[in-house]
Amino acid sequence: MVSVESMIVGVSFRAFSCVLVLFQLIGFMNFPIKLHQTTGLTIGDHRWSTSIWWIIQLALTVICGIMAKRNYDNLFNGLLLTDAMNNYFKFGLGLLTVFVTLADSWFGIETHRSIWMRYRDLATRNGTFFGLIERPQLVRVLIRFFFVFLVIIAVCAIVERQFYYDIAYGSQWHYFWTYNLYPYTISHFRHVYHLLHILLMTANVRQLQKRLSRLQQLGVAQQLEACRVIYGQLWQINEAINELFGFSQALNIACSFAQIAFDLYWIYAMLMSQDTGLKCK
């Protein structure tokens, strides 16, 4: 009879496989990668069959910009200067964030692969499952990630539905929001993917810290030197993560703050228009 623990492990790995496929469809990963619950991490070389999804995302981003230009009157025309500038910055910065994210994913393919390959090499060298952590520890990390992932999706879906069908329905803001949904969604997925790398790195660093604490108590100098090599590997992984996500995440965070600021202004404008009896376009 299958135990509850084995069911949780199986569901966690299958769910994580689906998440990896999702990140490939979005264009973040341009190489095949799988994490099996028994064989561990499998990483393939860069291939065009995987990169086709990156090309599709790039095409969608270009089409999104072209359609916004063609429908300029419906998106921006007739608004007050402050409202129009808000929409310009919000849409333009969001679209730029997507372009930079896709550029980082393409030009940083080998950097990206090196992150996962170093985790695999650490596991092979130390007889562990993923980096320095064993399978039960990895399952706990994945469960924590899935919880955060589902909460973010649920909150965003509720907010978007409320806005789309209630708050701005029938207004010009409603039309603009539909165009801004694509870069807005890609921005959130980039945050989530970065969060995954942070959680995995944190789990490995904690495991290294535990090893160092045990070895310091025993006073084993030779094994301390081995841990120094492991620390070097984790440092290289961290540097690769910073290189892969650095510029795109800086722009992504700026885009998120701009989104919040402009949305707060929009709410203020809506409240003022309701108070004065004006119709919000």
Where are these regions (language model features)?
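Membrane-embedded alpha-helical segments and the immediately adjacent membrane-proximal loops
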Residues: 1-281
